[in-house]
A protein has these predicted regions:
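N-terminal leader/targeting and accessory segments in enzymes
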Residues: 1-49
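Phosphate-binding loop of NTP-binding sites
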Residues: 47-185
Length: 185
């Protein structure tokens, strides 16, 4: 999967992918090489959707809650996990305490959810960063509920302004992502 990152463009590394055994490339712009390519307007979104299909839509097999906001995601996820456990559920959490990224890249995320379902987890609470929302890491995810903790001045180096930051966070609350929304007033 080739896409433009913040610092690098993975289209520049297609020969490494080919040497590594890739049988095709998903690209956002045609590359002048004799190699199978699928051109997508968003390779990241396609990667997320393919990961969901590859892992057989694991978020549909577990009660899933996504938590977003500037602050309080980790605390909220841990409280939800404790409540689920007290209610007799087997919880799993995904976030800053369990990984390097607040929200893992789509293939890693889908694998973690599939592994959780396979090990008997019945409840998933996960942190969902604004970066992950804009980078389509959760495209196709089925959340039973989405929680918004707050929005304050942060990550403006990435988003540019508060309106863009707000719009990124609000993506989690679209009907295609969440059945229920909980907004901290």
């Amino acid at each position: 999967f080739c896409f433009q990152g913040e610092k690098n463009d993975s289209h520049d590394f297609v020969y490494d992918a080919m040497k590594g055994g890739a049988s095709a490339l998903v690209v956002e712009k045609k590359i002048d090489i004799d190699f199978p390519q699928v051109i997508s307007s968003s390779s990241r979104k396609m990667m997320s959707e393919i990961a969901e299909i590859f892992y057989d839509f694991p978020s549909r097999e577990i009660t899933t809650v996504g938590v977003t906001g500037t602050n309080g995601k980790t605390t909220t996820v841990n409280i939800l996990s404790a409540i689920a456990e007290a209610a007799g559920q087997k919880p799993k959490t995904i976030g800053t305490l369990t990984g390097q990224l607040t929200t893992p890249e789509a293939p890693d995320l889908q694998r973690q959810i599939r592994d959780s379902v396979g090990s008997g987890a019945s409840f998933l609470a996960m942190e969902v960063s604004s970066h992950a929302l804009l980078q389509h890491r959760i495209s196709g995810m089925a959340y039973d509920a989405a929680i918004f903790t707050n929005l304050s001045l942060d990550h403006l180096d990435y988003h540019g302004d508060m309106e863009s930051y707000y719009k990124a966070k609000s993506l989690l609350f679209s009907p295609s992502h969440a059945k229920l929304a909980v907004i901290n007033a």
